Amino acid sequence: MNANPKFLAATAEVDAAAVAPLPKSRKIYETGSRPDIRVPFREIEQQDTPTMFGGERNPPLTVYDTSGPYTDPQAHIDIRRGLPELRRAWIEERGDVELLAGPTSDYGRARLQDPQLTAMRFDLRRPPRRAKDGANVTQMHYARRGIVTPEMEYVAIRESLRREHYIESLRASGPEGEKMARRLLRQHPGQSFGAAIPAAITPEFVRDEIARGRAIIPANINHPEVEPMIIGRNFLVKINANIGNSAVSSGIGEEVEKMTWAIRWGGDTVMDLSTGKHIHETREWIIRNSPVPIGTVPIYQALEKVDGKAEALTWEIFRDTLIEQAEQGVDYFTIHAGVRLPFIPMTADRMTGIVSRGGSIMAKWCLAHHKESFLYERFEEICEIMKAYDVSFSLGDGLRPGSGYDANDEAQFAELKTLGELTQVAWKHDVQVMIEGPGHVPMQMIKENMELQLEHCHEAPFYTLGPLTTDIAPGYDHITSGIGAALIGWYGTAMLCYVTPKEHLGLPNKKDVKDGIITYKIAAHAADLAKGHPGAAVRDNALSKARFEFRWDDQFNLGLDPDTAKEFHDETLPKDSMKVAHFCSMCGPHFCSMKITQDVREYAASQGVSAQQALTQGMQEKAIEFVKKGAEVYHRS
């Protein structure tokens, strides 16, 4: 479906499903050292424990929130106007940027002057910004100068998840508050494989990690609407959602809707991979309405400008595309600068060849001209553009394996070493960098990927697509990849790129986006637990407590997808009265293991003994009863 100009100009509306608050949740804000640092969280209300289980109060639980203003009932959402400029004052007060008269890219100016696009164009009233001559506006540049920016303080508060507040509320919950706090804060020791995860995230720790290149805050100065977030091995594992139109499917309205839907369910960043019509206009609508960082693959649009002929690409066209997108506010670029001419023959014996779109484009260009890639040769010039807008590099893995057969081969690791070399070049310019990774990798080969990335890329954040652990399940590749994502996240990957059920089959719709997001939220959280990230088990413990106490609504609401959990429960037990029942349809009222355990505990309390003693005593009583009845195995009814 192509974009409808009249629809966009006159009737563009936010997706109603994306703005409704999640059940029993409310948006709250934590204020930092200045009034304009207001960090959003989602607070989930809980019911009190039933009297028969102690009657204690269960305080609200705070969770990370990526949905921006969309789930705040106090916010007025109008996608035709875009989101508030959260970071505008922070950017301007640093005094190192200038306002341009308008777009400076040839393509950007041409689109602005095309009257046929007026009806569909986002009505942006402000000009783009750029660093003043000689200035560097990256978060890494500030960090290396010892400056803690508002963005750094913001992410420090965000990563802490108001944990101290939750601990205090547990202790104040009643006479058993201290005991309750100990129980709900209990967490198994993790294995972080050498990561340096602190007990508490401070603004200074954030600054130090960015200065070292171990973390990035993707935040273009032309995306003031973004709510800062951090990607790094020593922080919570993040996930990315891919959206984007194609030549045969989807338009601007649908892509904005996918973005708002993705962030509702937990997408930390979104990549717009559009390759169809109106790429420039689609991206503008997405960025102006996105509270999360937006990434792109600029070579896709550059290819469209030469009618899909890779050999016709030039440095000048690519450079103009970088500037065009940087002035719109793209926060990170995937650039496949590691696909070098000498590496292409290494893929000859692969089962699936070069599967990266960007990688195949550059491979074709290199072979057509029999020259080294202009992305590699002009890399320092690319860095000059990046640091003028604070666009982060996502150095693309154009030679990633497209099947388990090709995993961990010579081509893949030759490119990885090159990405490590380019990382150091970017850091020389104080440009933020993360490294993209595979792909398709059997489970036993995943850890090697993480170890070599840390070695060759100097601990720059790793950002992987899965990896898919088997190739036998088209239609279920969110699962085949979720397995690999959980493992590589545990080993140290900082951000996981989601895979939807439509992977290898078609363009994902809204349902596919949600399925991919939830799958990857599970993988990321499982990785945080395995790494021993402080406080990672709090939500698990709260949900387990609700489950044991048959607080069904709390079970639904504390989960990643309350709607689906409630829907499944309602399929067999739809009545409201069943939301307090001490069983579900799996086992019924007489075989619920948790109900039986509670019966044992009640018996123990009535007898003044421990639960273990009660089990022993109960068995003895049954033995005596058995003997009194004649010690017969069977009795007539």
UniProtKB/Swiss-Prot annotation:
[4Fe-4S] cluster binds at C584, C587, C592. Pfam families: ThiC-associated (PF13667), ThiC_Rad_SAM (PF01964). Keywords: 4Fe-4S, Iron, Iron-sulfur, Lyase, Metal-binding, S-adenosyl-L-methionine, Thiamine biosynthesis, Zinc. Zn(2+) binds at H440, H504. It comes from the Bacteria. Its cofactor is [4Fe-4S] cluster. It is an enzyme of class 4 (lyase). It catalyses: 5-amino-1-(5-phospho-beta-D-ribosyl)imidazole + S-adenosyl-L-methionine = 4-amino-2-methyl-5-(phosphooxymethyl)pyrimidine + CO + 5'-deoxyadenosine + formate + L-methionine + 3 H(+). Binds 1 [4Fe-4S] cluster per subunit. The cluster is coordinated with 3 cysteines and an exchangeable S-adenosyl-L-methionine. GO terms for cellular component: cytosol. The keyword Aminoacyl-tRNA synthetase does not apply. The keyword Zinc applies. Coiled coil: none annotated. InterPro entries: ThiC, ThiC-associated_dom, ThiC/Bza_core_dom, ThiC/BzaA/B. One of its GO terms (biological process) is thiamine biosynthetic process. Substrate binds at N242, M271, Y300, H336, S356, R357, G358, D397, G398, L399, R400, E436, Y463. Its EC number is 4.1.99.17. Homodimer. Belongs to the ThiC family. HAMAP family: ThiC (MF_00089). Catalyzes the synthesis of the hydroxymethylpyrimidine phosphate (HMP-P) moiety of thiamine from aminoimidazole ribotide (AIR) in a radical S-adenosyl-L-methionine (SAM)-dependent reaction. This is Phosphomethylpyrimidine synthase. It comes from Bordetella avium (strain 197N). The gene is thiC.
